[in-house]
Swiss-Prot record:
This is DNA polymerase I, thermostable. Transmembrane segments: none annotated. Disulfide bonds: none annotated. Its EC number is 2.7.7.7. Belongs to the DNA polymerase type-A family. It comes from Thermus caldophilus. PANTHER family: DNA POLYMERASE I, DNA POLYMERASE NU.
Length: 834
């Protein structure tokens, strides 16, 4: 058993913790941290981490944690407006505060709440008693009110780590501790609604105290205070000043019995259960509650069947990596392979964290290894924020090390623990066994297969783009009147807003400078010809630097093909993503994006087959909402955008013009992503009131869509998560946020996820069902991008493969509306799209 972190040490030092303040601070600092059940725990985690940091840096004879009592304090009675300006307590803060108090009790620390007094007064009184007995005192808080207590033996320990001492106050402000209350009284404190002296800021207050020494002396000599306007401000707010002084001064005379020996031994088992319940796996280690890594029980290679595998690669990309180490674990016994590559031949299946990666590497070496159970997939289904093995290990009680044997052991333990957590979750288990686990086999094969690139074409395109970029630069310089660095945002800012005097439409958050973002430039497109040229320059430069130039260097020398990585546990909706390179971001509709697709070509004697789900998200919406009008449009094979326009504008379908159809299309897809009337008015360049009317007419045309959205949000608020048709979850705790902008962003996320996630599940199901049949026909699955699947088949059988794939995708799962797939074939990806 690992030695527990020493919580008490007889070093003559006492730690006082401002519990309420620390909890509130971490509540907002770590917003969004939840358990896999969607339970918000950010304040609890942040509080525990802050405590650990303090405890590790120093040993303490006693630890006291002080919270504000529920009853009003004497300050509320003296000043009715005290703290009246504070925002209401967030809804899930009280529940987390209760958990923090439970944690304090389990740690054996003394917990105090004194009715009628704030935590500041309790802390101040506690600080004075040990100080008198010769102990050093540390007060863990970020509350600046308590800086008045610092002395030779009392220091404030800021959660970020620095100590506030008399020397620190003097160096930072030129103030002595006894002047701190006077300083606070002069400047006031908006967070506590303390008025201070209106018009006097920190700079003036420091100057006054430097000259007069104290507030008392300043007030005695008020008629001599200069300048006159400062003197008059103080005279006009004397009552506020005296009140602020009274309220800022903490009490040190509370009738408290302080026993430095009253702390208890921590409840080790209770603490372990608490941390496991909240999924604070990393804290188990930090508190010293994990089983000590006992010497591994080792056995000779090869391992028995069903063992979990651990491995270490020289780099993340398996097609390019060296296999540095290989081990396996079964029932706690580990087996190390002396020669990792040779050891692969003894495996029939890869079970373990990142199983797909090892299967890809094995395929590169000519071995057909099937990826099997992967705890990463289980963790991802529990909570899609579980995206890395390091994070999963920390969360569920383990450590991701660079040792292959420990990785194998970790995989076995995590698999067992995660399956326990999924007991009773039939939908999630179905997704694991029927979708995610078999899909990892498909993706491993796709990664190992890769896709051929026309390198000569890309090199020629690069030269062409370089010339076009140079021409655009000359145009920009001509319009600006002089050359400048187009890649320098500061120089561009000066040209646009100082020299050409274009309107500045926004500022950057970090620096406050005038923004030159794409959104700002789009809004300025019509304001000056230079903007259009800059946007074109940016697009060409980005695609040249991101795709056209790097792609040839990513072609593997042994295969002559490009091998992208498909990430199965990276998105919150269940969609796949790709990396090294990221093919999802190649523009589909722009001419240049299409020219990049032209570089993806078929092997000689083969053809590419491109299959694209048509309007799959709108079809999923029809099924989920059960809206009869929406369902009927798809069942009858009508154009959804034309029909929507017909209902929205009150005209027959044959009278719908292109502008009407475009408006309806924007609304159809905008509804899926929670587009506001303001955004719609910008997209369509129409008045705001007209955009509001468009959205309202849409919901009148499809009334059950609105009802489904409202039902989805209501269930999400109650359960803390939303789910797809197949039960895939996304936790959305901010559905209950009090801040309107935060809540509305969560709402858009919440009703989009079931649609987008169901579409992703349908694509995955289709891939799993189609894969073995393609292999039988000698065809290959190459890429999955957005709603599209790219295959490669011998030319002689390409049409048969296309027909088979189209049928498999359209019949992936029965819905209330038919799924429709558009098919094309060609020598390259662009021509296959038609």
């Amino acid at each position: 058993m690992e030695a527990m972190l020493p919580l008490f040490e007889p070093k003559g030092r006492v730690l006082l913790v401002d519990g309420h303040h620390l909890a509130y601070r971490t509540f907002f600092a770590l917003k969004g941290l939840t358990t896999s059940r969607g339970e918000p725990v950010q304040a609890v985690y942040g509080f525990a981490k802050s405590l650990l940091k303090a405890l590790k840096e120093d040993g303490y004879k006693a630890v006291f944690v002080v919270f504000d009592a529920k009853a009003p304090s004497f300050r509320h009675e003296a000043y009715e407006a005290y703290k009246a300006g504070r925002a209401p307590t967030p809804e899930d803060f009280p529940r987390q505060l209760a958990l923090i108090k439970e944690l304090v009790d389990l740690l054996g620390f003394t917990r105090l709440e004194v009715p009628g007094y704030e935590a500041d007064d309790v802390l101040a009184t506690l600080a004075k008693n040990p100080e008198k007995e010769g102990y050093e005192v540390r007060i863990l808080t970020a509350d600046r009110d308590l800086d008045q207590l610092v002395s030779d033996r009392v220091a404030v320990l800021h959660p970020e780590g620095h100590l506030i001492t008399p020397e620190w106050l003097w160096q930072k402000y030129g103030l002595k501790p006894e002047q701190w209350v006077d300083f606070r009284a002069l400047v006031g404190d908006p967070s506590d609604n303390l008025p201070g002296v209106k018009g006097i800021g920190e700079k003036t207050a420091l100057k006054l105290l430097k000259e007069w020494g104290s507030l008392e002396n300043l007030l005695k000599n008020l008629d001599r205070v200069k300048p006159e306007n400062v003197r008059e401000k103080i005279k006009a707010h004397l009552e506020d000043l005296r009140l602020s002084l009274e309220l800022s001064r903490v009490r040190t005379d509370l009738p408290l019995e302080v026993d430095l020996a009253q702390g208890r031994e921590p409840d080790r088992e209770g603490l372990r259960a608490f941390l496991e319940r909240l999924e604070f796996g990393s804290l188990l280690h930090e508190f010293g509650l994990l089983e000590a890594p006992a010497p591994l029980e080792e056995a000779p290679w090869p391992p028995p069947e069903g063992a979990f595998v651990g491995f270490v690669l020289s780099r993340p990309e398996p097609m390019w990596a060296e296999l540095k180490a290989l081990a396996a674990c079964r029932d706690g016994r580990v087996h190390r392979a002396a020669d990792p590559l040779a050891g692969l031949k003894d495996l029939k299946e890869v079970r373990g964290l990142l199983a797909k990666d090892l299967a890809v590497l094995a395929s590169r070496e000519g071995l057909d290894l099937v990826p099997g159970d992967d705890p990463m997939l289980l963790a991802y289904l529990l909570d899609p924020s579980n995206t890395t093995p390091e994070g999963v290990a920390r969360r569920y009680g383990g450590e991701w090390t660079e040792d292959a044997a420990h990785r194998a052991l970790l995989s076995e333990r995590l698999h067992r623990n995660l399956l326990k957590r999924l007991q009773g979750e039939e939908k999630l288990l179905w997704l694991y066994h029927e979708v995610e686990k078999p899909l990892s086999r498909v993706l491993a094969h796709m990664e190992a297969t890769g896709v051929r690139l026309d390198v000569a074409y890309l090199q020629a395109l690069s030269l062409e783009l370089a010339e076009e970029i140079r021409r655009l630069e000359e145009e920009v310089f001509r319009l600006a009147g002089h050359p400048f660095n187009l890649n320098s945002r500061d120089q561009l800012e000066r040209v646009l807003f100082d020299e050409l005097r274009l309107p500045a439409l926004g500022k950057t958050q970090k620096t406050g400078k005038r923004s030159t973002s794409a959104a700002v430039l789009e809004a300025l497109r019509e304001a000056h010809p230079i903007v259009e040229k800059i946007l074109q320059h940016r697009e060409l430069t980005k695609l040249k630097n991101t795709y056209v130039d790097p792609l040839p260097s990513l072609v593997h020398p042994n295969t002559g093909r490009l091998h992208t990585r498909f990430n199965q546990t990276a998105t919150a909706t269940g969609r796949l993503s790709s990396s090294d390179p990221n093919l999802q971001n190649i523009p589909v509709r722009t001419p240049l994006g299409q020219r990049i697709r032209r570089a993806f070509v078929a092997e000689a004697g083969w053809a590419l087959v491109a299959l694209d789900y048509s309007q799959i998200e709108l079809r999923v919406l029809a099924h989920l909402s059960g809206d009869e009008n929406l369902i009927r449009v798809f069942q009858e094979g009508k154009d959804i955008h034309t029909q929507t326009a017909s209902w929205m504008f009150g005209v027959p379908p044959e009278a719908v013009d292109p502008l009407m159809r475009r408006a309806a299309k924007t609304v159809n897809f905008g509804v899926l992503y929670g587009m506001s009337a303001h955004r719609l008015s910008q997209e369509l360049a129409i008045p705001y009131e007209e955009a509001v009317a468009f959205i309202e007419r849409y919901f009148q045309s499809f009334p059950k869509v609105r009802a489904w959205i409202e039902k989805t949000l209501e269930e999400g608020r109650k359960r803390g998560y939303v789910e797809t048709l197949f039960g895939r979850r996304r936790y959305v705790p901010d559905l209950n946020a009090r801040v309107k902008s935060v809540r509305e962003a969560a709402e858009r996320m919440a009703f989009n996820m079931p649609v987008q996630g169901t579409a992703a599940d349908l694509m995955k199901l289709a891939m799993v069902k189609l894969f073995p049949r393609l292999r039988e026909m000698g065809a290959r699955m190459l890429l999955q991008v957005h709603d599209e699947l790219l295959l490669e088949a011998p030319q002689a059988g390409a049409e048969e493969v296309a027909a088979l794939a189209k049928e498999a995708m359209e019949k992936a799962y029965p819905l209330a509306v038919p799924l429709e797939v558009e098919v094309g074939m060609g020598e390259d990806w662009l021509s296959a799209k038609g």
